[in-house]
Amino acid sequence: MSNSPFQQEVAKRRTFAIISHPDAGKTTITEKVLLFGQAIQKAGTVKGRGSNQHAKSDWMEMEKQRGISITTSVMQFPYQDCLVNLLDTPGHEDFSEDTYRTLTAVDCCLMVIDAAKGVEERTRKLMEVTRLRDTPILTFMNKLDRDIRDPMELMDEVENELNIACCPITWPIGCGKSFKGVYHLYLDETYLYQTGKGHTIQEVRAIKGLNNPELDAAIGEDLAEQLRQELELVQGASHEFDHQAFLQGELTPVFFGTALGNFGVNHMLDGLVKWAPAPMPRQTDVREVSAQEDKFTGFIFKIQANMDPKHRDRVAFLRVVSGQYEKGMKLHQVRIKKDVVIADALTFMAGDRSHVDHAYPGDIIGLHNHGTIQIGDTFTQGEDLKFTGIPNFAPELFRRIRLRDPLKQKQLLKGLVQLSEEGAVQVFRPLANNDLIVGAVGILQFDVVVARLKSEYNVEALYEPVNVSTARWVECHDAKKLEEFKRKSEQNLALDGGDNLTYIAPTMVNLNLTRERYPDINFRKTREH
């Protein structure tokens, strides 16, 4: 295979997202990753609001003026010989289906765990999503500068709860006030921790070898001996690193450190660029597309709307799968069978929203969207194919939506269907009545929908509680059995925005009983876009 400039560009791309429970330290680790990638000169700390440190890195702060906060969505930075694309997954309040779908656009994930707490609920959910594509996972056990749980116990919990084998790459020496550093099992080096160096890249002292007298002198004989004994146990009880198992999502390399103290993040980044895959092939409804192909293909995984009614622009995020994007090129939008000239795609380099001239597989570009682009749309240079694996997820929160002005029913329905195509929310129309039920994954989605209905469709809507706790898409290969099911379960059936049959259950117990009663019916948690 000739190593053309194009192939070199593809080979150096690494595209990943960070998954964590709120407060496990995702914002801090994002900052430190950017610091090591020299994307920002100095990281602010989230704690030091009163000090001269900014609450976050400056450009993140600028994003707070509620325009399209696009720069925090995709950040590109160089690290060693690679070019890394970090896709942000929104945190607490902004948690939505976007968070899930972003994970379908990456080739690898970094799971950040608060080592004082272990595996938490949001992490479990996000890991379930990575399982849809067996995404490779690296793990960073964070907050070693605080008192943490036993490291072996933490790894056991990850293995048991998330069903993935753990392979420690670094191992902590103490924690909290007595945190001394980490030992790298594969380089046979100990790195010593210094406090108070969180916002700059520090020179870390490395001591080669476990039996080096320097180690005893640096951390004390007792701790050094304890470390040797611990490592004997660890090496006996844990998995060896196996690159193939990692690439198949079966094994996760585990790193220990403190993002706030800026320690251990670089070991994880070294592992990421060394082991994470370059842009991967993607399945379509016709064939598999390799990143090395010279014709451009890509898919839309997220649409970001503007909260400012003065600017209606929305940006559609496109993951480049193959070929090269060049400014002004003509692309074929497969779903609507139309050619479009893309003159002003956006890129996201270290926090600047700027126009892009070139993009390669693994890169994310932003397309201006005036309502013609939907999630799951495929763009090609003419070939008629559609990328698969961009799912809708069953919502977990439901509200009935009501109009202040009943004469605007038509506009309401139109608005909701369009917003559901964009992925802002899901809409369900029960077969048994004229209600409109809105479903979301994150609570903020409801507020966004009401605001956008008002500003874009001139519809004033309000919510009421509704007796729905979960929804599943319904499939059955036997038309007769499906008809019988529809007849008997009409009270619990609805059509979603794309007219797909959906079972809306008042309780999980109801759903489980219905499943048992109708074993031939498939109740699905995800549905292809």
UniProtKB/Swiss-Prot annotation:
InterPro entries per UniProt: EF-G-like_DII, EFG_III/V, G_TR_CS, P-loop_NTPase, PrfC, RF3_C, RF3_dom_3_sf, RF3_GTP-bd
Primary localisation category: cytoplasm
UniProtKB keywords: Cytoplasm, GTP-binding, Nucleotide-binding, Protein biosynthesis
Biological-process GO terms, alphabetical: regulation of translational termination
Keyword Secreted in record: no
GO cellular component, one term: cytosol
Compartments (UniProt record): Cytoplasm
Keyword GTP-binding appears in the UniProt entry: yes
GO molecular function: GTP binding; GTPase activity; guanosine tetraphosphate binding; translation release factor activity, codon nonspecific; translation release factor activity, codon specific
Function as written in the Swiss-Prot or TrEMBL entry: Increases the formation of ribosomal termination complexes and stimulates activities of RF-1 and RF-2. It binds guanine nucleotides and has strong preference for UGA stop codons. It may interact directly with the ribosome. The stimulation of RF-1 and RF-2 is significantly reduced by GTP and GDP, but not by GMP.
Name this polypeptide is given: Peptide chain release factor 3
Origin species: Photorhabdus laumondii subsp. laumondii (strain DSM 15139 / CIP 105565 / TT01)
Taxonomic lineage: Bacteria, Pseudomonadati, Pseudomonadota, Gammaproteobacteria, Enterobacterales
